[in-house]
């Protein structure tokens, strides 16, 4: 263990992973959007603050290209918890895998909760964070979601409706996502590089590999990303 402190929910050790490897091409900037300055601070720092202020995490892992470490360090230097840096992978899921291995190498045990959040979603609330962690502790994993309000149409042939799913069964996924370290790391270790590269969603991957994924309550604002 990195620390003897117990914060938040009982004795479960909780480690947050901030994914910060994206390029942010939609904004037409040479600077990745998570590092754009807003009121004198990079966007990623607002995400970090939300989790620190929730008093739910014991350690922070930032997955980012090493060229940005010197830029980020002044914004995390005063945090009263351990901070580690993981290397980004070829895909989002490879980046997550790198972070999981780093956590294990620093004393992570199977029942630790790993909370994953995108660095460009700074509007997440403490309640959403809390509910996601609680859902993970009671199950194998959790993802913040909101109920779908619009009717969703399916088309397996491209042009005409082939099915209309029942709206009450549909949920839109957000971040954070939370996973029990042991089970989530294991399903990565048992898959090939190519299989991990094909993953399009962390919670979907957990579900398809047999983990029980709880749908925790999200918020409309949490859907907004910069």
Where are these regions (language model features)?
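Single conserved hydrophobic/aromatic residue that forms the stacking wall/gate
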Residues: 1-13, 225
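Conserved core of the sugar-phosphate nucleotidyltransferase
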Residues: 123-216
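Acidic helix N-cap motif at the loop->helix transition within catalytic regions
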Residues: 69-75
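N-terminal glycine-rich phosphate-binding loop and ensuing alpha1 helix
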Residues: 14-69, 83
């Amino acid at each position: 263990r990195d620390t003897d402190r117990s914060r938040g929910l009982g004795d479960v050790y909780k480690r947050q992973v901030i994914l910060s490897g994206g390029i942010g091409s939609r904004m037409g900037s040479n600077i990745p959007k998570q590092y754009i300055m807003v009121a004198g601070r990079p966007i990623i720092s607002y995400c970090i603050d939300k989790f620190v202020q929730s008093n739910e995490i014991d350690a922070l892992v930032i997955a980012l290209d090493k060229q940005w470490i010197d830029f980020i360090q002044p914004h995390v230097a005063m945090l009263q918890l351990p901070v580690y840096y993981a290397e980004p992978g070829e895909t989002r899921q490879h980046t997550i895998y790198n972070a999981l291995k780093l956590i294990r190498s620093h004393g992570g045990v199977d029942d630790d909760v790993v909370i994953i959040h995108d660095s460009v979603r700074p509007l997440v609330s403490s309640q959403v964070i809390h509910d996601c962690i609680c859902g993970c502790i009671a199950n194998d994993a959790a993802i913040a979601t909101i109920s779908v309000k619009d009717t969703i149409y399916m088309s397996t042939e491209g042009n005409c409706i082939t099915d209309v799913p029942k709206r009450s069964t549909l949920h839109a996924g957000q971040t954070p996502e939370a996973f029990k370290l042991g089970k989530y790391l294991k399903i990565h270790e048992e898959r090939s590089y190519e299989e991990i590269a094909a993953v399009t969603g962390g919670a979907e991957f957990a579900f398809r590999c047999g983990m029980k994924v709880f749908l925790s309550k999200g918020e409309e604002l949490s859907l907004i990303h910069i």
